[in-house]
UniProtKB/Swiss-Prot annotation:
List of glycosylated residues: N209, N404, N460, N546, N558, N562, N574, N599
Designated name of the protein: Heparan-sulfate 6-O-sulfotransferase 2
Membrane topology, from the record: Single-pass type II membrane protein
Region of interest called Disordered, as start-end residue ranges on this chain: 9-52, 529-612
Entry keyword annotation includes Transmembrane: yes
Family designation: Belongs to the sulfotransferase 6 family.
Biased composition (Low complexity): 531-564
Gene Ontology cellular component annotations, sorted alphabetically: Golgi apparatus; membrane
TM region positions: 5-27
UniProt keyword list: Glycoprotein, Membrane, Signal-anchor, Transferase, Transmembrane, Transmembrane helix
Molecular function terms, GO-annotated: heparan sulfate 6-sulfotransferase activity
Keyword Transferase: yes
């Protein structure tokens, strides 16, 4: 059977260019039969110097030399294994178009070649790296020539191991919040993460006298029951950051579910479809935008249990929490926020069952917003709610007639508002300060017995700190917020006293626990020693012989002698000698034996603690 023309040309020697013709090179590619015949009909041409390949469906002869840059079989199989799942990930319409393009332009061979050549290049580079490493370790035995087959298999194993690690990592950490952080939070904690906070803080001198009940804040929060945490969010106090900590950074049996693109998270109780947190990021602004204490106390029970009958409503404990900030910094931050177009028009300001009228609460600007407002204009408005905002939002406005300024004189009104805000703040379950992030985290954890996963961060640079004001403007801002200044001074004093009290209580509890462990170890040792001594005496001697040798037996003296011989080398030798001399004296009383027992046991306990 005669061979085809293209096969004969493929098996025959390649045509040489004409003598004197310039040497030219071309990129090897697949030729059709027509191109091969045309190339063969032009001896001396460039196409004649390139060996024509067979058409589709016809393989090369067994004598044809292999390509020099043919990748290993491992990479070809890996490319084929990776191409199918990658192609399956495309949408249905995209896959149909890719099939059409592949039938029309034959892109499969191009993709296959690119993938195999890329893997081959990576394999060769890794092979040289591995050969260099093995040559350093094993010497001349690890040569590149001897590692061709082994390195290819090793490379394939490394690639598969890498892909497996990526799959496991995507399973364990599916989103931006890796579950490993939650596992790390359940592990053993740092011995004392707040010691640096104690050392860095300056010495604090209290100004107010608070009782033990005011300083000791320990809330028995039952997240599986009906208790509810209500977050009172005051504008520009860092409440947004703290609110995110509550839904994203807190360690819970059933964490809040926060999905990408959604502003609210689902914070359900374990085993129930009820929320345990009433805040912006869990329930939204259900009582209005930045609702104050007056609105929340009358709105939250109706929102949570509004659909139930009054007789079937559970007896809930509403634990109110909030965050305060330095009044000057907060005022400047609100001014910068208003400059950017914030209005808080959605705030309801409901008091005593109705919102204020336009005469009771006039607006400081005309138009849609107050963007571009200068600081002087912001301070000149007498109806600006930014003035003394923290006192107004923490006090009971029903005591002063809500927003009706004609109910009582201004001086009396300010006094009632300030005292109401102080009282509500002191009786709140928890409040924090923006200027003390780590202390805020500590007090919240100790109050509710709920730990955060990662520590809070103290930001020293804010938009308010970037505003440069002179002393005159600062004095005026303090004058406009004189009630907030008084409230913040009171809150800071109470906050720092609570922190110091809780830290001292924690140290006392740790010291008491060590003492209990010491007593337990001492009793355990004495009990074990008496049992072993009594068993040894009963087995070695009879009762009559024991009485004849020692008419007045004293087990404490024997214990002292045994302790003096069995103590660790760290024990005091002088005390051992004194115990031996005391045991040899005749007529020694019970008190001397007890003294020796106490000394020997204390030395033993001390040696055990030194070893630990």
């Amino acid at each position: 059977m005669a061979l085809p023309a293209f096969a004969a040309r493929a098996l025959g020697p390649p045509l040489q260019p004409e003598q004197g013709a310039p040497a030219r090179t071309t990129c090897p590619r697949r030729h059709s039969r027509v191109e091969a015949e045309l190339a063969a009909s032009r001896p001396g041409s460039v196409a004649a110097s390139v060996r024509a390949g067979p058409p589709r469906g016809v393989s090369l002869g067994f004598n044809s030399p292999p390509l020099q840059d043919k990748p290993p079989k491992a990479f070809s199989s890996l490319a084929g294994a990776l191409r199918a799942p990658l192609f399956a990930l495309l949408p249905r319409g995209r896959r149909r178009r890719m099939h059409d393009l592949r039938r029309r332009w034959d892109l499969g061979s191009l993709c296959r070649a690119l993938l195999t050549r890329g893997l081959a290049a990576v394999g060769h580079s890794l092979k040289h790296v591995l050969s260099a490493i093995f040559s350093k370790i094993f010497g001349p035995l690890a040569s590149v020539g001897n590692m061709d087959e082994k390195s290819n298999k090793l490379l394939l194993a490394l690639v598969m191991l890498f892909l497996f690690a990526v799959i496991v990592l995507q399973y364990v950490c599916p989103g931006t919040e890796c579950q490993l952080l939650r596992l790390q939070a359940f592990s053993s904690p740092v011995p004392d993460p707040y010691r640096s906070e104690d050392e860095s803080s300056a010495r604090f001198v209290p100004r107010y006298n608070f009782s033990r009940g005011d300083l000791l804040r320990k809330v028995d929060f039952d997240i599986k029951g009906d208790d509810l945490i209500v977050f009172l969010h005051i504008q520009k106090t860092g409440g947004t950051t703290f609110g995110r900590h509550l839904v994203r950074n807190i360690q819970l049996e059933q964490p809040c579910e926060c999905r990408v693109g959604q502003k609210k998270c689902t914070c359900h109780r374990p085993g129930k479809r009820e929320t345990w947190l009433f805040s912006r990021f869990s329930t939204g602004w259900s009582c209005g935008l930045h609702a104050d204490w007056t609105e929340l106390t009358s709105c939250v029970p109706a929102v949570v249990d509004g659909k139930r009958d009054a007789r079937l409503r559970p007896s809930r404990n509403f634990h109110y929490i909030t965050i305060l900030r330095d009044p000057v910094s907060r005022y400047l931050s609100e001014w910068r926020h208003v400059q950017r177009g914030a209005t808080w028009k959605a705030s309801l300001h409901v008091c005593d069952g109705r919102p204020p009228t336009s005469e009771e609460l006039p607006s400081c600007y005309t138009g849609d917003d107050w963007s571009g407002c200068p600081l002087k204009e912001f301070m000149d408005c007498p109806y600006n709610l930014a003035n003394n905002r923290q006192v107004r939002m923490l006090s009971d406005l029903t005591l002063v007639g809500c927003y009706n300024l004609s109910v009582m004189p201004e001086k009396q009104r300010n006094k009632v508002l300030l005292e109401s805000a102080k009282s509500n703040l002191k009786h709140m379950a928890f409040f924090g300060l923006t200027e003390f992030q780590r202390k805020t985290q500590y007090l919240f954890e100790k109050t509710f017995n709920m730990n955060f996963i990662s520590p809070f961060t103290q930001y020293n640079t804010t938009r308010a700190s970037s505003v440069e004001i002179n002393e005159e403007i600062q004095k005026r801002i303090e004058g406009l917020n004189f009630l907030d200044m008084e409230l913040y001074s009171y809150a800071k004093d109470l906050f720092l006293q609570r922190y110091q009290f809780m830290r001292q209580k924690e140290h006392q509890d740790a010291r008491r626990k060590r003492q209990e462990q010491r007593k337990f170890l001492k009793g355990r040792f004495l009990q074990t020693h008496f049992q072993s001594q009594s068993q040894g005496q009963s087995q070695s001697q009879s009762p009559g012989q024991n009485l004849s040798q020692n008419p007045n037996p004293n087990p404490n003296q024997n214990l002292t002698q045994n302790l003096s011989h069995n103590l660790t080398p760290s024990s005091n030798p002088n005390s051992t000698q004194r115990e031996n001399r005391g045991s040899q004296k005749q007529g020694s009383g019970q008190g001397q034996g007890d003294s020796g027992t106490s000394n020997g046991t204390n030395d033993y306990i001390g040696s055990v603690e030194t070893w630990r």
